[in-house]
Amino acid sequence: EDEDWVVVRGDGCTVYQGTTEVKREIRQTGLSGAMMGKGNHRHFMLKEIHEQPAVIGDTLQSYVDPATRTVALPALPFDWSKVSRITLTGCGGAFYVCMVAKYWFEQIARLPVEVELGSEFRYRAPPLPEGGVCIAVSQSGETADTLAAVRYAKAEKQTVLSVVNVPESAIARESH
């Protein structure tokens, strides 16, 4: 959890929040060391660029039924026809992803979209309309500024969705 810290010893670990010991459910991640390392690439960005075709293919495969040639997306906690505005937020490369997604949402879904830099969103504190949806984009799901943006959007009664690579991440847990 946010602001937890852990002491790891040979016989186990102890989790603290501040100076208080807390009990947390122990979960094992599905990620392997190979997935988290940069392999033979000079840096993580280059690794991610080279992984894009496989990642996109794996993602689409989970939603496409090859027998019927149809796409089946999971149910969302809102009705798209009642969405008053979409706010996209992210930092770094995720911010640029949001800028591209803005065009797609506006051109295809015909919904108004704002793109907010995660590090500025909560400080700028824009008014967010009732019935709005905030989509947070973060590769790790742990980007502190994007997490703060998620919390601001939730406080403003927005439905919050996230696009992350780590289902156990803080941003994923705090999204709807």
Features from the language model and the residues they span:
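N-terminal segments that mediate ammonia production and transfer
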Residues: 1-81, 94, 106-108, 123-127
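Glycine-rich phosphate-binding loops that contact phosphosugars or nucleotide phosphates
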Residues: 81-175
